[in-house]
Every structure is written in structure tokens, then in C-alpha cells.
């Protein structure tokens, strides 16, 4: 997680440094926490989340969270390469290219059967190999029933289970917080974009949150609630700018394995959110203010 969350930027990193998707996701998480803690109103949360998803630089994100109480400072972002380092790498790259060209020339001189070492028309390796193309069709529309169940299946294939601290599902990508298998005191964050990538950040463990099975909810009911959420909140479907679903354990100590699902909907005319249980039971509705 980049160190722009209210703390000084890493050496070599400036407010003009381009933001990554993981930086934007981290900002949205802090804004979600600020909404739940009462630091932000629903309208402020909607405006800041909308700005965070469109942020271009770390400075843009830093301004959105600078006045919030961030509990823990994340790991520092790696410093940018110096001009001297870039120059050194450039020289190494040039030397590598030269050695490759030399190798091509030697190989052509020994084995070549064309007029030029750059003429590959007679390459004996350019023959049909009978390998058919593999077309990948990973889940993309994650707010549909097929997309949502497909995402959970992809999670099982990647990690062997669907255990974790929190799953945030956007229309076309998702993020997942899981326990670090090497140290159960730490949390690893993963991003899904057609497949679960490598861990993008490691943050301090949240001791008061349980690890639960994040798939233990009625997916069909959840999709129905998502599709009806704009009308439930008094918004037009065509006005919706963003919608995302958070799946996490309930804070009720009497039901530690139960899930709480929070659905946030934003538009240019206000936003609101719904909180419901894994079986679809509505717990809370926050209408646009």
C-alpha cells in the first residue's frame, strides 16, 4: 500500500507520481471506514469515492484522505529510480542488444541458409505445430449471477478456499484481504482482473476481525438486491455512477462466522447504501441525503 495515506511520501516519490489501481482501492477502503466511523457524511463519501476512482496521481488521493484519522501507516512505497540508475540500465540494455545481434550474426554464419541474418523466411522452426489457440473466458461482469459465482470459483482455484477478512466486488474487478500464510498476524491484499494476481500489499493485521468463509451467502439473492438497489434508494438506474459490494464478517460476537454484506450506490444526484445478511435479510437502508 503506497505511503500517501496522510504520511510523508517515500523518498523519490512525489505527489505527481502516477497512482496505481491498488492505491485507488486503498483510498476507497479508508473512505469506507471513515463513513462507518462517522467521519464522513454519505454525500461526502460518495463524492470522494467518485474522485478516488478517477484519481491520476498520488497527490490526488492524498488530498482525499488527508483530513481523516488513518489508524496505521502502511508500508512505504519504493522510491523511483534515479537518473543515474536509468542511465546505467540503459547502457546494460544496449550491451545486451549488441551481444544478441552478435550472436545472431555468428549463428547465421555457421547455420544460416539465407542471404541475410535478418531474413527468417527459411527459419526451420517456423513450421505448423498443431497447437490450437486457447481462448480464455474468465468471469468479467461480476455483479451478475454467473460472474459472482464464477469469481468465487476462481477464488477457490487460486487459494484452495474462500476464506478471508473482506471481499470487495466492483462491476468488473474485485479485491480480497486474506491472512498471510507465512505470518497469521498479517494481511495480504489481492486484486482480481480476469484472475487473482499476486499480493499487492501487506498491512498490519486487524485483530478484532475474524477470518470467515466469504462465499457463505445466497448469491442469487445478493444479485437481485444489487439490481434493485437504485430503485430501493430512490435513484434512477441510468444515473448510477458506481456500485460495489463489500462482503465481510459481522461484528456481532455471538455469530462470529456470519457474513454482513454492504452495497454502496453512488450517482450525481446522491448516494446511499444497504446492509443485509447472507440470506438477504435487510439490516439497514441509508437513503440519499
Curated annotation (Swiss-Prot):
Can you say where in the cell this protein is located? Cell membrane
Q: Where are the transmembrane segments?
A: 90-110, 257-277
Q: Which InterPro entries match?
A: DUF1707_SHOCT-like
**Which Gene Ontology cellular-component terms appear in the entry?**
peptidoglycan-based cell wall; plasma membrane
For this UniProt record, the keywords arranged alphabetically read as follows: Cell membrane, Membrane, Signal, Transmembrane, Transmembrane helix
Q: How does it sit in the membrane?
A: Multi-pass membrane protein
The secretion signal range is 1-19
Instruction: Please classify the protein's predominant subcellular localization into one broad category.
Output: membrane
Which residues, by range, are in coiled-coil regions?
none
Q: Which Pfam families match?
A: DUF1707
**UniProt protein name:** Uncharacterized protein Rv0048c
Amino acid at each position: 500500500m503506497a505511503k500517501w495515506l496522510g504520511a510523508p511520501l517515500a523518498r523519490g516519490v512525489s505527489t505527481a507520481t502516477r497512482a496505481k489501481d491498488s492505491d485507488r482501492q486503498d483510498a476507497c477502503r479508508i473512505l469506507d471506514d471513515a463513513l462507518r466511523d462517522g467521519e464522513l457524511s454519505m454525500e461526502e463519501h460518495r463524492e470522494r469515492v467518485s474522485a478516488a476512482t478517477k484519481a491520476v496521481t498520488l497527490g490526488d488521493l492524498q488530498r482525499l484522505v488527508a483530513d481523516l484519522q488513518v489508524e496505521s501507516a502502511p508500508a512505504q512505497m519504493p522510491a523511483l529510480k534515479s537518473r543515474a540508475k536509468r542511465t546505467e540500465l540503459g547502457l546494460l540494455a544496449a550491451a545486451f542488444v549488441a551481444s544478441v545481434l552478435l550472436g545472431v550474426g555468428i549463428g547465421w554464419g555457421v547455420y544460416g541458409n539465407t542471404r541475410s541474418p535478418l531474413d527468417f523466411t527459411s527459419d526451420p522452426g517456423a513450421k505448423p505445430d498443431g497447437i490450437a489457440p486457447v481462448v480464455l473466458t474468465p468471469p468479467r461482469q461480476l455483479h451478475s449471477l454467473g460472474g459472482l459465482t464464477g469469481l468465487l470459483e476462481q477464488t477457490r482455484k487460486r487459494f484452495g478456499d474462500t476464506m478471508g477478512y473482506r471481499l470487495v466486488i466492483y462491476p468488473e474487478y474485485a479485491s480480497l484481504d486474506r491472512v498471510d500464510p507465512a505470518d497469521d498476524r498479517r494481511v495480504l491484499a489481492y486484486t482480481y482482473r480476469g484472475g487473482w494476481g499476486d499480493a499487492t500489499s501487506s498491512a498490519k493485521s486487524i485483530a478484532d476481525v475474524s477470518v470467515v468463509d466469504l462465499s457463505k451467502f445466497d448469491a442469487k439473492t445478493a444479485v437481485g438486491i444489487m439490481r434493485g438497489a437504485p430503485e430501493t434508494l430512490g435513484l434512477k438506474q441510468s444515473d448510477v455512477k458506481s456500485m460495489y459490494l463489500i462482503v465481510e464478517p459481522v461484528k456481532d460476537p455471538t455469530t462470529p462466522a456470519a457474513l454482513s454484506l454492504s452495497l454502496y450506490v453512488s450517482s450525481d444526484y446522491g448516494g446511499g447504501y444497504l446492509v443485509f445478511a447472507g440470506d438477504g435479510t435487510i439490516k439497514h437502508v441509508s437513503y440519499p441525503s
